[in-house]
């Protein structure tokens, strides 16, 4: 990806005018787009402009992701959702305009301040869940909820952004060549996403549970040397209970997060509204959950592990999958 967007063969620079917007600063790369802070010369306000990378323009699937974000943002209006202000084309290059939010990403805060106090986590997660409940009521599933896609304003309010992977009612399936750019981020992907399913409200519940886990202990529930290893953990592993990782975390809160992170979607909270209700009554509610013990042994355990390996291979669409699968079989029979 270019460091700056290239328009008609010329690199977009600070101070340049792009349509009726004056470029003020280069902010970041997001997905397959370049993101700028700009000044709207017509409406006299600061905005953010998202311009797709040239490589995206030649990739129908990636361009579909950009177009999907345009459509989704037109339908949403909520305090915790980044507000879309418009879109257009300039010199044949499409762009998306959103409000400018003065703050920083939740990722930046986690890197500098995690772990966070329980009360702070519950307050923030409650607000994020409220925004996601609004999305779900409007038939929008985010499917890429992660700290990088959540801004925290200077007064501590969360703002959810980047709906490029969102699933909407009646949306057709798009085939992508790049898994991580399409299905989500491996660290926050629900098992059903890894298996190639489209997902539903419970997919976002899983991602939010992962964010809670990371905020509370400063580490991910699943780790690995590479994306495949991380995805295999999501498919077949069980995250260590939070109250065992950090004994200061209440068993009730640990139970909430464990329920969000259940491998089987049917074992999670059915939607964000149910999660909000539990969070609101966490001090008094009976949050006891049954611990599921993996009693698989011998060939049953091997079959479970093999299923995880195959699921990751299918999700990645690896050309050399048969070779890796053979290595997996050899490992299981050692």
Which residues make up each language-model segment?
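Protein kinase glycine-rich loop
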Residues: 24-30, 35
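AlphaC helix of the eukaryotic protein kinase fold
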Residues: 53-75
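Activation-segment/catalytic-loop signature of the eukaryotic protein kinase fold
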Residues: 87
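Conserved short submotifs of the Hanks-type protein kinase catalytic core
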Residues: 91-105, 109
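Activation segment signature within eukaryotic-like protein kinase domains
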Residues: 124-125
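Protein kinase catalytic-loop region centered on the HRD/HxD motif
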Residues: 130-140
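Activation segment of protein kinases
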Residues: 155-191, 195
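C-terminal lobe helix-coil module of Hanks-type protein kinase domains
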Residues: 185-287
């Amino acid at each position: 990806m270019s460091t700056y967007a290239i328009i008609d063969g010329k690199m977009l620079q600070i101070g340049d005018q792009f349509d009726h917007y004056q470029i003020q600063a280069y902010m970041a790369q997001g997905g397959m787009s370049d993101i700028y802070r700009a000044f709207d010369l017509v409406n006299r306000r600061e905005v953010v402009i998202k311009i797709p990378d040239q490589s995206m323009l030649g990739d129908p699937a990636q361009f579909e992701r950009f177009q999907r974000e345009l459509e989704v943002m037109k339908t949403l209006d909520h305090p915790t959702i980044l507000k879309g202000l418009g879109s257009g084309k300039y010199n044949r290059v499409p762009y998306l305009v959103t409000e400018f939010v003065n703050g920083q990403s939740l990722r930046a805060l986690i890197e500098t301040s995690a772990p966070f106090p329980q009360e702070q986590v519950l307050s923030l997660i409650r607000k994020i869940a409220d925004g996601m409940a609004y999305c779900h009521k409007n038939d929008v599933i985010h499917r890429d909820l992660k700290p990088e896609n959540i801004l925290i304003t200077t007064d501590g309010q969360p703002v959810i952004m980047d709906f490029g992977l969102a699933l909407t009612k009646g949306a057709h399936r798009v085939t992508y060549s790049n898994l991580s750019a399409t299905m989500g981020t491996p660290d926050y992907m629900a098992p059903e996403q890894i298996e190639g399913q489209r997902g539903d409200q419970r997919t976002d519940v899983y991602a939010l549970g992962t964010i809670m886990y990371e905020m509370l202990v400063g580490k991910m529930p699943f780790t690995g040397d590479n994306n495949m290893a991380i995805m295999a953990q999501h498919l077949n592993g069980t995250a260590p209970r939070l109250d065992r990782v950090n004994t200061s975390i209440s068993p009730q809160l640990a139970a909430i997060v464990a329920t969000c992170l259940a491998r089987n979607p049917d074992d999670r909270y059915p939607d964000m509204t149910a999660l909000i209700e539990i969070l609101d009554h966490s001090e008094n509610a009976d949050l006891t959950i049954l611990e599921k013990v993996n009693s698989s042994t011998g060939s049953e355990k091997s079959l479970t592990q093999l299923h995880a390996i195959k699921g990751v291979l299918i999700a990645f669409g690896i050309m050399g999958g048969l070779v890796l699968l053979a290595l997996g079989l050899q490992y299981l029979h050692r």
